[in-house]
Amino acid sequence: MAFNFNWSPLMADAGFYTRAQDLLTAALNKSPKPPIIVDDIKVTELNLGSIPPDLEILEVGDLAEDRFRGIFKMSYNGDAFLTLKTRVQANPLNTFLVTRPSFASPKPLAAASGLTIPLQITLSEFRLSGFVVLVFSKQKGITVVFRNDPLESLKVSSTFDSISFVRDYLQKAIEGQLRALFMDELPAIIHRLSLRLWVPEYRDRESESVNTLDLSSESGPGQDPLASPPQDPVDASGNALNPSEVASLSLDSGVEIHNLFSHKNLLRLAALTDSQRTLSLFTPSIKDVVYRAWTASAELGESNTLTSPTSPVLSRTHSHIGSLHSFVDNASTISMQSGGSSNFSGFGSYLRPGRHSRSHTKKRKKRVVDLRRPKTTDDVDSVSGDSVFSSENATSAPTIFSSPAHFSEEKNDDPVTPPLGPQNDLHLPTIHERRRISQGDQTLRRSNLSMSEAAQPSSSRSAQMIAETWPDPDATPRNTIRLPSNDRASNRFTAVSLPSSAIQYTPTVPINNNNPREQVWLSKMAAELARRMQEQKIDPSGSRPFPDFWDDHSREEIPPPAYGH
C-alpha cells in the first residue's frame, strides 16, 4: 500500500507557517535552556522544503473512514531549514558563577559582568530515520509518536562559525536540544496543528483566545505611579507639606507633581550616601562597587608619618675583613686595615649600622658592639672623634688598638661605603698558625733571657702591658662598643686605632706581670718574629715558617656586591 503526500499546500499556506513558528518558539523556550543562552529563542524563519518524507507501512492496526492507526518507518533527507535568533553570554566567568552557589564561589566585580552577544543559528540538512506510530482521527486530530530517536544528523550554521570550538559546542548543544524536541515536543505541535485544520470547534476557541490577548495588549499602559502624590510629600527645601498644600500645588499648572519627593525616599538616599563613609554592616548592594570606609584628612596625614614597628629598616650592610696583617714590634699586636671585600670567615661579626638604632626617626649612629661578657666590671674609655681607644685598668675588658706606624694615612670617612676594588694585602692567620706563633714565643723566651734588657718606648710598653693582660691565643676577635667620651685629658694611655669598619686581633702569650724584664723581652721577641716573617714572605728563596698561610692568603679575593637601599 502506498500514499501520496500533497506537499504543495503546506508550502503555499502562509498562516500555517506563522502558526508553526509560534508553536516551535513556545516549545524551544519551554524546556530548560543552557546557562550560556540568556534570552528567549525565537524562530524567525521556517521552510519545510519541496521534498516530502518517505513512509513505509509496517503494520496497520485500525482502518476506517474517519480513523486510522498504523506503524510506519519514516526517513527524511530533504531541504527544509529553520532559523533561530537569541542572545548568548560571552563571559565564561559569569556563566560559571551563575551555575554555582553564591556562598561557595568568589565574588569578583567587573570581571564577572555579563557580556551578551546576539546569535543567529540556521538548522539545515536534516537527516531523519525512525519508527513512527501514527493515529489519525477527524475528531481528535493526528497523533505521532517516535519509538526511537529519529535524528541522525543536521548542519548548524551560526555567527561564530569562524571560531572552531564555539562552532563545535553549538553543534553539540543544539543536537541535544533537537533530540529532546523530536521525542517530547514535536508530537504535541503536530497534534495542535491537526486540530486547527480539521476540528472547527478548536479553531473557533483558539481564535477567541487570540482576540482576548489582542484586546488586553491594546488597552494602553497601566496607571502611572508618579501621577498620584506621595503619602508624605516634601518641597524642594525638605519641608513637609499637608494635603491642602498638595492639592493647591496640583491645581497650579506651573508646578509639576513629579517635583514632590517622598520624605522617606530622601532619607533613604541620604542613608545610601552616608553608608559609603561608614563601616555600616547594612550597606546596600550596588553592582560592581567596592565599599570602603573614608578616613579624615587628619588621619590620612598622620598615617603618612607612622611606621610599623615590625617593618625592617633597609640599609646597606657590609662584611669587613682585615687586609693588612703585621706583627707590631712595639705593641705585639696583629692588626688589620679595613677593606670591604669578602665574607668574614668566622673571625668576627657582621656590622649592621642601621639595625641597632633606637628610633627610625633619629639619625643613624655607627657603632661597634662587643658581644663578649666582661670578666669584671671595669672602665672602658674610647674617643669617638678620631677612633682613639684607651684603657686605664689592666683588668678591664679588651679593647681594639694598634700602632699607627704600620698603617697608611688614608682616612676612612664613610666606613659603610665599600671600596672600588679588592686589596691584595695580608690576611689574618688561622687559629692553627696563631698557636704555632705562641709556641714559638714561649720557646724563644726560654732560650734568650739575656735579651730582656733592651729599652722600649714608654708608649710601646704601655700598649704591651694592656695586650698581655688576656692570654687567649685561640680567641675569636670581636668588635667592642665605642662609648662616647669627651674627657681626653683623663686618658693616660692612648693609641690610634683603625676606623670603625676594621677588626683587629691581638695574640698574646702567658706572661708574668710581676717581672718587667720578662715583659720587655717578650715585646722584643714578638717584634723580631714579625720582622722575620715579613722577610721570609718577601724572599722567595728563603725558608718560610708558614708556607700554607702565605699560599692561601696570596690569592685575590673578589668582594661581594654592595647592598642597595
UniProtKB/Swiss-Prot annotation:
UniProt feature, compositional bias: Low complexity: 382-391
Let me see what the UniProt entry remarks about domains: Lacks alpha-helical transmembrane segments, suggesting that it resides in the membrane via beta-sheet conformations similar to those predicted for other outer membrane proteins and porin.
Where in or outside the cell is it found? Mitochondrion outer membrane
Q: Where is the composition biased (Basic residues)?
A: 353-367
Q: Which gene encodes it?
A: mdm34
Q: What's the protein name?
A: Mitochondrial distribution and morphology protein 34
Q: Which family does it belong to?
A: Belongs to the MDM34 family.
> What is the membrane topology listed in the Swiss-Prot or TrEMBL record?
Multi-pass membrane protein
- SMP-LTD domain location, by residue? 1-208
Kindly state which keywords UniProt assigns to this record, in alphabetical order: Lipid transport, Lipid-binding, Membrane, Mitochondrion, Mitochondrion outer membrane, Transmembrane, Transmembrane beta strand, Transport
Q: What is the lineage of its organism?
A: Eukaryota, Fungi, Dikarya, Ascomycota, Pezizomycotina
Subunit annotation: Component of the ER-mitochondria encounter structure (ERMES) or MDM complex, composed of mmm1, mdm10, mdm12 and mdm34.
- Domain of life, per the record? Eukaryota
Molecular function as annotated in GO:
lipid binding
The terms describing its cellular component in GO are:
ERMES complex
Q: What is its main location?
A: mitochondrion
**Which residues fall in a compositionally biased region of kind Polar residues?**
209-220, 392-402, 439-463
PANTHER family per the record?
A: MITOCHONDRIAL DISTRIBUTION AND MORPHOLOGY PROTEIN 34
| Protein's job | Component of the ERMES/MDM complex, which serves as a molecular tether to connect the endoplasmic reticulum (ER) and mitochondria. Components of this complex are involved in the control of mitochondrial shape and protein biogenesis, and function in nonvesicular lipid trafficking between the ER and mitochondria. Mdm34 is required for the interaction of the ER-resident membrane protein mmm1 and the outer mitochondrial membrane-resident beta-barrel protein mdm10.
GO biological process terms held by the UniProt record: mitochondrial genome maintenance; mitochondrion-endoplasmic reticulum membrane tethering; phospholipid transport
* Record region (Disordered): 209-241, 347-463, 533-565
- List the biased-composition ranges (Basic and acidic residues): 368-378
